[in-house]
């Protein structure tokens, strides 16, 4: 467990100034989700560390749950910092006999095909990085409480070890943080069966509680949509013979949603501007393509009791949205 602040190793030449232990056990209720009640039970150890000249101090906090472990840094020093790397490593005892399921490490997308292969063959992976040991134990490497910090992917280093790799800023620095700062949790979930990973509340328990005092106005819903066909290559975003967001296709999806108790239909590629993808990224957020009759589709959806969810892409050009929003 290491990190770099500038060119300085966080834990090199440091002195442990204190070790604390505590336990916690509570049950909390979620307003919605797969499970209503979540048990948050863990044993905790905090290790306080300081440089001899007292210029850098931080705490390493570890938590052991019934179904996994987690750890993070809590920094406390007077000046802001430029974090250049995080060198947290994840080592597997027998990589050749430990199977994994993951997508390739990518800072821009999670819409990739999952791979099933031994850990020994992994060069990079997004998290959650799911694995099964040779003796049948399931696990997953992930993160929790990710605030004001880059996402983590796993990448094999020159020593052959899977190491945390953080998405960089344009200048190459990983994060600019205030002197008092808490990093995300690094998590490892453990289960006898794969379903135990899905049912685990470990990551939820480590995230901050919701700051929404009254969530009654938020209504979870299911949707079907015109978008995945583009990623599969069977449809395209732009108008033409293979256009996905057409009036005919919209009606078909609305009928399916109404017949199966699905509340909404999502449309991607319905508005003009997708032909600019990869160029100036200028989208029109009010004008549909000619083969997408928005008024007819909206009236039909209203008749069927189905909501329309319109995807408005920016392509990273967030400023292009402002003129359109002013027209609404």
Language model features by range: what are they?
Residues 27-41:
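Edge strands and adjacent loops of beta-rich recognition modules
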Residues 1-6, 10-11:
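Single conserved hydrophobic/aromatic residue that forms the stacking wall/gate
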Residues 51, 64, 90-303:
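Conserved structural scaffold segments of CAZyme catalytic domains across common CAZy folds
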Residues 70-74, 188, 307:
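Residues within well-ordered beta-strands of beta-sheet-rich folds
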